[in-house]
Amino acid sequence: MVMFYLGNVLKLSLFGSSHGESVGSLVDGFPVGYKIPLDYIQKYMEYRRPGNTIITSQRKEEDVVKIISGMHNGFTDGSPITMIIENKNVISSYYEELKENPRPGHSDYTLYVKYGDFRNYEGGGFLSGRMTAPLVAAGALAKSYLDSLGIKITSYMKSIGEVTCDEIRGDPYNFETRIPDPEKNSLATSLLVDIMKSGDSIGGRIDTIVEGLPPGVGEPFFNSVESEISRAMFSIPAVKAIEFGDGFTLSKMKGSEANDPFTVLDGHILTKTNHNGGILGGMTTGMPVKFSIAVKPTPSIHKKQDTINLISKEKSEITVKGRHDPCVAIRAVPVVECLTAFVLMDLMMMGGFIDRYGNVRGRSLL
């Protein structure tokens, strides 16, 4: 059974494929009477859009979001919101060879096992990174709503290969690698140029910080903040790992080191440290929510690779054609940011912090 939806009260469905006429999202449950900020949504589409720099895929798409339902006179009207993004720069001929020869590291083989000859293999079909475009469109709508409540979500490239950012020194979107540090951005750019020349690719790590969330967001047991964010993050192609707070480092610490002592500041209960990433018992503590994801290298590379012919079961070789990112993690930054917003807004609606009519509970906590 295929389920193309995310969310519990606020729901998101996807449709389309990489080389189809369009891709899109359907958002159901969004509060009524909210003015849809089209310019804001388009800004995040531009952050994700391919072809903007030499270090991203040269598939040049306009990625203009068209809303065909759920909006009346610029405001949400209570019905499902349908967002469509056209595919205009498609070259399917690159993928004919892949019909019988699956790319290592890609979903070509698993799609064949599951759907056989009915699978859509062109451009990766509905499992392509292209499907992150409608994720951004829907997520940017939620992010704008949380922005209005004073909830700030920031995602950035913590590292590309061995180039690591130690501190945020500017807006990540002012740097082409999304590493918010001038020196490290320059180093990463040089690394990516070399990677491209060699026909290879490289992975990266994306860190996210959420500030301004009230305590108590999250629904134990199976709808915890961690489980809901994790489910969403693993819907992003190439994401292979996630950790919250100090994550795996906590396994090496003592309880006296890992526990975050409570304190009071200006009448608000906070913690002196934040090793647990602002989450305890699956619910927010009021401290910043922090998590990191690992994104594997783009599997489509221009180096010759060993594979198997699916029909003959004999060994074969493949050199992937087409236009691909040397580091797919870079364009995933706005995807992570926007999808995080969607999940958190859904959890806030589940917990009664926000209702279908835009009423906000405990506004003073925000």
UniProtKB/Swiss-Prot annotation:
GO terms for biological process: amino acid biosynthetic process; aromatic amino acid family biosynthetic process; chorismate biosynthetic process. It comes from the Archaea. GO terms for cellular component: cytosol. Its EC number is 4.2.3.5. This reaction introduces a second double bond into the aromatic ring system. CDD domains: Chorismate_synthase. FMN binds at G281, K296, P297, T298, P299, S300, R323. It catalyses: 5-O-(1-carboxyvinyl)-3-phosphoshikimate = chorismate + phosphate. Gene3D superfamilies: Chorismate synthase AroC. Reduced FMN (FMNH(2)). Its cofactor is FMNH2. NADP(+) binds at R48. The lineage of its organism: Archaea, Methanobacteriati, Thermoplasmatota, Thermoplasmata, Thermoplasmatales. Pathway: Metabolic intermediate biosynthesis; chorismate biosynthesis; chorismate from D-erythrose 4-phosphate and phosphoenolpyruvate: step 7/7. It is an enzyme of class 4 (lyase). Disulfide bonds: none annotated. Keywords: Amino-acid biosynthesis, Aromatic amino acid biosynthesis, FAD, Flavoprotein, FMN, Lyase, NADP. This is Chorismate synthase. GO terms for molecular function: chorismate synthase activity; FMN binding. Belongs to the chorismate synthase family. InterPro entries: Chorismate_synth, Chorismate_synth_AroC_sf, Chorismate_synthase_CS. Pfam families: Chorismate_synt (PF01264).
